[in-house]
């Protein structure tokens, strides 16, 4: 083995390098020739194998020839009687993963070791054999493996059981035949054998709930003695309790009693596992109390691992049931000064969740002394906990905002500073009294901020919120400093922010004009262009609208064209005398190009430029407008994503795309024939619109021929009332003439047979008439909507699994675009606000504010507020929700 390389540094301190420092594959392969020596040197061979294993584990690749040569050389080492070398040989064979041809060569040696009198040889031979053999060879050694499972030596039995766990993935039918032997292993007096036996038995039965329930019921009566196996059994027991929700509560009681009994076990790991599982379950406060008591005792343990496990579990409980953890607050406060920073961090964040309003100031003082000693990742956790606490006790915002401000001045990375800024922004938006002090803290931060992203984000916030404060002029100095001192990106953001102050605060407009004129001499094009645009807009020289409201809409309004769609349209735009018309750009957020199924293996040539993405509506518009029957339908409003009408792996793959016009709907059926021996001709879809009374079929375009694996389209058009979100259910039958094809010659029989194929029903729902269009600033967009168009009502959504499910269901019904990440519901939240935007058929902009709350154990109530360009559309949104 290579000797450690020693080196003296300038401070005369010894630096010890890895014993493998500087080894090369070529040199090690040369050394591997020692395996062929007639007189084997076990020590030298062990060193060479160790180097080979090191290279393999470092990701070094061996060619096929190199791997084969090493494998054959290693097999020569079976003649050595050195136990240490033999164990390395086993490892080497596993790492090389020999091919099926090479496995035969080593199988006989491993079989011999598997029947050896040396237990170490037997155990390792079993592990290696099960790693390298296939199903055919497995049947030949199955008898030996079953015997090994019940072997008296625990090392051999564990090796066989662990091998069974690995083999179960590829050869489940064979391993399932070992159930009797595995059950016997579960009763073993050896801890590891019982642990591995229980793990394998559970995997064998994992798809049979009744068998798992019976297994758990039998084992919970006291036959499991191994602490490791006890931990597994606790997990399986909690799984049975969760899955038996259909049964009465009484039937779960024996299982829960077992979990409670484990809280009094002599093994600490069993106690912790039981407490953790009880804490994760939906139990009453009385049932949870024993687990909390046990965890509280562990908080004062002398073992760091027990303190960490206990405080981590309590931290999770505090997220959903903070009152249950309040009794532990005194012990948690003592852990804030724990030498282990992970324990201290968890203790602090738990206290922040369980603390009351009177303890906030004391907690903040302790946290201040603590923050400098922990890493950024832990600081982020603390900052997020403080944000939640501030929202819980808004009257304490001053002390917490002051803490966040001080944290901004400390050293830290981007993610840490971003977490603080995001927290301050959240508090500004949720606590009105905190707005001005929060904005000032952010202004002080950007005076010495090294992160361009954060500076731009804060400047954007200042532009939106600053003009609405009591003294907007106090922010101008901070903003203009960015124009003087920062990079081009931040300077451009600062110019836009100044313009917003000029537009909204008339008293500041002359001063803003002076500052913007100075920006006309900036070295960066973007900064100069923005300054020019805003000066001419605010001065009235460039007409962006007839009223002051139009000017503010220009400055503050949301950009309702997705940037990806705009980019695609600009790439296809050909410079001409006509100006670029942004109204022609698709406003759909989720764009999906129309793609045909490619033959397998066909890829674009290397280096070929990727085609620019084309919004789905643009692609479909070109196809539909080229069909004379549809050319008079007008502008395509929306195309849905494909809806599958057949199961996977069926004879014919069919999906449908719904194309929505103002007074028509076109159904595009995309069909693929997956049977090589068939050719389909005169293919059409018969659509029954009996359950869609407002629709009447006007025309259809059948498919003349549908060869194997060549997609084709069938179109069926319906007329409906103009600008009305008509809904209905359509049943579909695919009809065609099928002809046999000789796959060897490609010849098609002349005679065909009429046939039909029933496919799934299709529904046109209200969400199909809504475009998912985002707004960049929901608050400004909402305020700019006519308040007279607002309609508000409350609804009961019934029993739901969670608020997240309720939010997802309403978004799905409306088909609108969530804004500002509000579709994500914080875990265990009891109330939530979701903001949605979209464009309803007839090009009416719609904004929705949804307020959810839990009115009972799982009863969800919702308040729906809608604003729109058209008050009638606001009423329709309420009708959709009421009928949904």
Swiss-Prot record:
Keywords: Cytoplasm, Cytoplasmic vesicle, ER-Golgi transport, Golgi apparatus, Membrane, Protein transport, Repeat, Transport. Its main location: cytoplasm. It is found in: Cytoplasm; Golgi apparatus membrane; Cytoplasmic vesicle, COPI-coated vesicle membrane. Belongs to the COPG family. This is Coatomer subunit gamma-1. InterPro entries: ARM-like (IPR011989), ARM-type_fold (IPR016024), Clathrin/coatomer_adapt-like_N (IPR002553), Clathrin_app_Ig-like_sf (IPR013041), Coatomer/calthrin_app_sub_C (IPR009028), Coatomer_g_Cpla (IPR032154), Coatomer_gsu (IPR017106), Coatomer_gsu_app_Ig-like_dom (IPR013040). The keyword Protein transport applies. Residues 602-612 have a biased composition (Pro residues). It comes from the Eukaryota. Gene3D superfamilies: Coatomer, gamma subunit, appendage domain, Leucine-rich Repeat Variant, TATA-Binding Protein. HEAT repeats lie at residues 65-100, 101-138, 286-323, 325-357, 358-395. The keyword Repeat applies.
